[in-house]
Amino acid sequence: MKPENFRADTKRPLTGEEYLKSLQDGREIYIYGERVKDVTTHPAFRNAAASVAQLYDALHNPELQNTLCWGTDTGSGGYTHKFFRVAKSADDLRQQRDAIAEWSRLSYGWMGRTPDYKAAFGGGLGANPGFYGQFEQNARDWYTRIQETGLYFNHAIVNPPIDRHKPADEVKDVYIKLEKETDAGIIVSGAKVVATNSALTHYNMIGFGSAQVMGENPDFALMFVAPMDAEGDKLISRASYELVAGATGSPYDYPLSSRFDENDAILVMDNVLIPWENVLIYRDFDRCRRWTMEGGFARMYPLQACVRLAVKLDFITALLKRSLECTGTLEFRGVQAELGEVVAWRNMFWALSDSMCAEATPWVNGAYLPDHAALQTYRVMAPMPYAKIKNIIERSVTSGLIYLPSSARDLNNPQINDTLAKYVRGSNGMDHVERIKILKLMWDAIGSEFGGCHELYEINYSGSQDEIRLQCLRQAQSSGNMDKMMAMVDRCLSEYDQNGWTVPHLHNNTDINMLDKLLK
């Protein structure tokens, strides 16, 4: 049963309840040595699933619809999240930015692979279906389905970290490849990583990242859509921070881990049949190599990613201020300066999102894309602040991060609660319950296993650090910006030589130079 068939009304996207039901499809998910029967009820996934369901419910909230939704452009007469429709102007992109931000605030910026992330893939299908050649109609059909239903896609485009120095066709026992072609579709086998939150998605887009060595065997040159319930398709999940939080603590102890854990997984495909209508690129290395930029996704997803990070930094900035109120150090000049630096990082990413929209450029078929220079700047800068901000928090909050009882249960023990009330209270009249609550939230954000995973996530979000810098350089060269910068330096160099100024408006110094006299 297709996910869209769970809708009671075909003129709207899924509701939260319908989304959860659509995940109960027998998908093959493994964690802790066992197969998961139902991701919507399993303690490793259920709160993350409920958090995604909250996003879908927001699309039907009358108070949020003006910010979140537009009418579809597919002829259905329905409505959808704004980022699921192709932008046709700079103002469209600005409205999409605001819709992305509104959705992201529901998870305080802590869920990055929400349905709007891969809506950028759907937008590329709709704006430039001709890129896919013989599979153009497939692109059009998927754009329609993704938009009208709000389908939740993820992608798995990175090969496992095994022999990455070799071309894909030399690691044929690991990397995803064509096994055979049939009338019904193609049969594929192999593995991809890192399938973040795929356990809670409807489909995975399988393809190539931009920096991978592809080789010459066209059996590896594939891009297709794989249903999460396809026979032979399995996910092997990493440890669940949500489950650990539930087993060892409470929401008071782990308020982020216990609901926003987007579980990463190894995606394994064992002779999976991919119907022809799900194929987008087939045995075509040239198109695979060109897809990153020409397919549109790489020009669209940075808007969602930048806004999501900006929302997250809003949260972290305010949480740092609240933590400093707990410790009584907020009035210290040096501490205020540190907080000011965090505010500056936050401001930068919001400013980049403004620039992406305000300087948007026309693309193909009337579509508009975020400004290329701004999005490439975001990709280079995004890994930088997180470790820096974490270090600022550690320096300014200091022992407050660990001067905490083990659990909310300690507050329910009358033998120690009075002691905690005296010695673990906050500053300026803040009681111990509030102080502990705030600082446990901060610890979950930066010090827990969940927090550590997010640091790794932000550092590597856009892929190879070298590659994103090279792409930023190539953009400067291809846009003409590098030529303009070089021309400015050349103009400066041309205004003087070893004999003095070469431009008429400046005075040479022969009348005041003292060197001849001094050297006699």
From Swiss-Prot:
It holds the Pfam family HpaB_N. GO terms for molecular function: 4-hydroxyphenylacetate 3-monooxygenase activity; flavin adenine dinucleotide binding; oxidoreductase activity, acting on the CH-CH group of donors. Induction: By 3- or 4-hydroxyphenylacetic acid. Its EC number is 1.14.14.9. Pathway: Aromatic compound metabolism; 4-hydroxyphenylacetate degradation; pyruvate and succinate semialdehyde from 4-hydroxyphenylacetate: step 1/7. It catalyses: 4-hydroxyphenylacetate + FADH2 + O2 = 3,4-dihydroxyphenylacetate + FAD + H2O + H(+). Gene3D superfamilies: 4-hydroxybutyryl-coa dehydratase, domain 1 (1.10.3140.10), Butyryl-CoA Dehydrogenase, subunit A, domain 2 (2.40.110.10), Butyryl-CoA Dehydrogenase, subunit A, domain 3 (1.20.140.10). GO terms for biological process: phenylacetate catabolic process. Keywords: Aromatic hydrocarbons catabolism, FAD, Flavoprotein, Monooxygenase, Oxidoreductase. It is an enzyme of class 1 (oxidoreductase). InterPro entries: Acyl-CoA_Oxase/DH_mid-dom_sf (IPR046373), AcylCo_DH-like_C (IPR036250), AcylCoA_DH/oxidase_NM_dom_sf (IPR009100), HpaB/PvcC (IPR024677), HpaB/PvcC/4-BUDH (IPR004925), HpaB/PvcC/4-BUDH_C (IPR024719), HpaB/PvcC/4-BUDH_N (IPR024674), HpaB_gammaproteobact (IPR012688). Utilizes FADH(2) supplied by HpaC or by another flavin reductase, to catalyze the hydroxylation of 4-hydroxyphenylacetic acid, leading to the production of 3,4-DHPA. Belongs to the FADH(2)-utilizing monooxygenase family. NCBIfam families: HpaB-2. 4-HPA 3-monooxygenase consists of a reductase component HpaC and an oxygenase component HpaB. This is 4-hydroxyphenylacetate 3-monooxygenase oxygenase component. It comes from Klebsiella oxytoca.
